[in-house]
Amino acid sequence: MIFVGLSHKTAPIEVRERLAIGRDRLPEVLARLTAHPAIGEALVLSTCNRVEIYASPRQQAPAPPRPGSAPPPSDEELSRNNEALRAAVATLVGLGGDAVRGHLAGRVGSDAVLHLFRVAASLDSMVVGEPQILGQMKEAIEVARGAKTLGVRLGRAAHRAIKVGKRVRTETAIGAGQVSVSSVAIDLARQIFADLAGHTALLIGAGDMAEAASKLLVRAGARLIVVNRSPDRAAALAREVGGEPRPWADLERSVIDADIVISSTSSPNYVVTPDLVRRARKARKGRSLFLIDIAVPRDIDPAVNKLDSVYLYDVDDLSQIVAESVEGRAAEAARAEAIVADEAQAFEAWTLERALTPTIVGLRARTRSILVAEVERSLSGKLRHLGVAERQALAMMIDAATNKLLHVPTTRLRAMASDPRVAEHVDSLRELFDIDGAPPENAAASALAEGELRGAVDGPPTPRSARGAAPPASGARGGGSPRHADPRPQAAEDNGVYARQPGGRPAEAGVMAVANPAAAVSAAGLKGA
């Protein structure tokens, strides 16, 4: 898994706003990413403070090398491959230009997972502890699921990230009080006006951040005006908090009436321009105008800051207030970091154990195939008389024996998942049990995980002589003939002791003609682990 992106920590707002990806564009970007031959899964998180892409390679790492095979890729080769993949991701989403490259951050493997978890826990947010990021991440995951770009690995990482965020908010007080970009904006307003009571605040926009800001403004005693392109949304928000809704056409008049303007829309263009502010200044008769722009892309043209008696602040200007907030939450942030580290370690353990799944599946298939072959040999001979109940009991006994035989080896193998020498242990195990060399039809016996033996449903075979047919010739199997002698006992074929392969040819004794084990593994979500 890799991560490529930028945030308020690596790029100024003028860079972030150029690269912001709106929700309506996310499916297109996700499709472009997963169309790349090297990318199997993708997740895009775009907020006012970050644009981040998480991706997982289409092909997982190969199984441990067999003796005499080519050596595994070196750390240098893996690094080059990861760098190439990161470069491809950056280019596909428009982050590959020279002007942007210096602002990019990247992580690979467990470091990428750790970063994802820290973001979900709001530890990487401009305002540590802010709750909005968890909702934004849920929305990004929902879009990726809808676009079918989340698979086993990245899908699980995303799911765990949400759990991590919830756990941090439940087990720590990192989100206590008012912690969000909106709350920081109101704190700034309080610094400008010692008391907001009696002052008029204009809120441009009616989204989540605008709603949060409106409640704080009203609580502080400010008179609130709400302007939004959608009159209905403006009216709904104003009604909820006791403000005054105005149509978009009254934006300039509202700027004239306001002491402070807070803007938070999703517009791709400036909604407050220097010309609008110049006209408003004349009508304001020298009153200072304070504007706080918490939107990305920005709503207010930064050129208005050059006008007399006009003071503009954007999200990057809120950093000093944020720093004070972080200091007060240092202890809770440390507790949150410990939770994130614990969850990241657990995810890494799952990843390592998952890589062992093909070997464990192969070992169980190998063991089961041997037991099945021996039991079916007996069922075609001395135990032909067994009924349905007895055959079902044998099937259960095979399962129980397989589980008991392999419980200790598989438990210890999983415990070795984080051992640097695990590849050597796995290779030895596959060599000792000839897991890679097992005939496909023997491996197919793994389907007995369902607990079936041929004949367990059909019941005991009816002797051929009882159906009016002659008994098997002396040269038939079971009468001392060579292994490949034919014909095989017709009763055995008719009653399922021998399964038929495609084309009607009976399989070897003790072999189950069932689905390809690779397909079964794939259906179980384990292929390529």
Swiss-Prot record:
Q: Where is this site: Important for activity?
A: H115
- Give its E.C. classification number: 1.2.1.70
Q: Where is this region: Disordered?
A: 56-80, 454-505
Keywords tagged on the record: NADP, Oxidoreductase, Porphyrin biosynthesis
**What Pfam families does this protein map onto?**
GlutR_dimer, GlutR_N, Shikimate_DH
- List this protein's GO terms for biological process: protoporphyrinogen IX biosynthetic process from glutamate
Keyword NADP belongs to the record: yes
Record-annotated active site: C48 (nucleophile)
Task: List the biased-composition ranges (Pro residues).
Answer: 62-73
Broad enzyme group: oxidoreductase
Sequence ranges of Low complexity compositional bias:
464-475
What InterPro entries has UniProt attached to this entry?
Answer: 4pyrrol_synth_GluRdtase, 4pyrrol_synth_GluRdtase_dimer, 4pyrrol_synth_GluRdtase_N, GluRdtase_CS, GluRdtase_dimer_dom_sf, GluRdtase_N_sf, NAD(P)-bd_dom_sf, Shikm_DH/Glu-tRNA_Rdtase
Residue numbers binding NADP(+) = G205, A206, G207, D208, M209, A210
Please give the catalytic activity noted in the UniProt record.
Answer: (S)-4-amino-5-oxopentanoate + tRNA(Glu) + NADP(+) = L-glutamyl-tRNA(Glu) + NADPH + H(+)
Tell me which residues bind substrate. T47, C48, N49, R50, S125, E130, P131, Q132, Q136
GO MF, one annotated term: glutamyl-tRNA reductase activity
State the pathway, as annotated in the record.
Porphyrin-containing compound metabolism; protoporphyrin-IX biosynthesis; 5-aminolevulinate from L-glutamyl-tRNA(Glu): step 1/2
Its assembly, as annotated, is:
Homodimer.
Comment field (misc): During catalysis, the active site Cys acts as a nucleophile attacking the alpha-carbonyl group of tRNA-bound glutamate with the formation of a thioester intermediate between enzyme and glutamate, and the concomitant release of tRNA(Glu). The thioester intermediate is finally reduced by direct hydride transfer from NADPH, to form the product GSA.
What is known about what this protein does? Answer: Catalyzes the NADPH-dependent reduction of glutamyl-tRNA(Glu) to glutamate 1-semialdehyde (GSA).
- Give the domain note: Possesses an unusual extended V-shaped dimeric structure with each monomer consisting of three distinct domains arranged along a curved 'spinal' alpha-helix. The N-terminal catalytic domain specifically recognizes the glutamate moiety of the substrate. The second domain is the NADPH-binding domain, and the third C-terminal domain is responsible for dimerization.
UniProt lists the family membership as follows:
Belongs to the glutamyl-tRNA reductase family.
Q: What's the name of the protein? A: Glutamyl-tRNA reductase
User: Where does this protein come from, organism-wise?
Assistant: Sorangium cellulosum (strain So ce56)
